[in-house]
Amino acid sequence: MESLRRRDFIRGMSFLSVAAGVKPAAASYDPAAKFGLKVSEVEYRRTKAGRQLMARIYEPAGTGPFPTVLDLHGGAWNAKDRKAEEPMDRAIAESGVLVVAVDLTLAPESPYPACVQDANYAVRWLKTKAASWNGNPAKIGVYGSSSGGHVAELLAMRPRDSRYNAIPLREAPRADASVAYVAMRSPISNTFARYQNAEKLKRSAMIRNNTTFFVPWDTIHESNPQEILDRHETITKVPFLIMQGALDDNVLPAVQERFAQTYRDAGGDIQYRLFEGCEHEWVAQPGPQTDRAREMVKAFIARQVNAS
């Protein structure tokens, strides 16, 4: 009992140190390490409609503190949940990373910016909770897939946007939503270009997913990461990793490459990696390119968290 009280005290002090601007000591991260996992779930908030938004926690079995990553799922803003990227989440967590995958509000229930508000809240919430799962709350990273990558880009570029900060975190009102780095697979980095591609290909489901999410319609431009850069908005620039399938006809490689170059030209640190022979969701299937993606994400995390 005494050891449990001591552990809880240390974890509580870890968050207080972060809130005060003091970074807790963190062990170096070895992406080749192997850990067992404890997987659990908790509710992290409820939507206006009363729907539970759950967080799935992949906690390495070790002492830590481990690097901490928030996973934002894809699904074209209209589908999927925290389990969508489970194979990737497990692969990252088994190397010694606390991975927390969260549900996001879906567009049929509430359009933009609801899911970005969820992500913003989730970062602040995770900063208060990471230590209780042996994670380091001082340097939160993000992994985002497809539309989750779009949310991740907005989250990272606009961490203090009052619209995105709209949901108060009562237990830590001063916590901020800044993140340290973002790794992404097939992010929708140019929302309007993707919509134009859907129209060209006559993909009714993709078109509908856009019209249900971007309400009013001009938000497809306001929330477009490419256009944010083109407008020279004042943004926060954290290191980005973009992994892109060369055969992706959902998010076109040329569009993705343009975003990467624009981010780089704006002074951002970005790695753009093309995966030959791969489509939009190649990481959903086992294979050499999926293994390569997992190793790439882990190496990217290592470079961020082990940097002096």
Give the ranges of each region predicted by the language model.
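N-terminal secretory signal peptides and thylakoid transit peptides that target proteins
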Residues: M1-S17
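Short beta-strand element of the alpha/beta-hydrolase
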Residues: P65-G74
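Alpha/beta-hydrolase active-site loop
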Residues: P111-A130
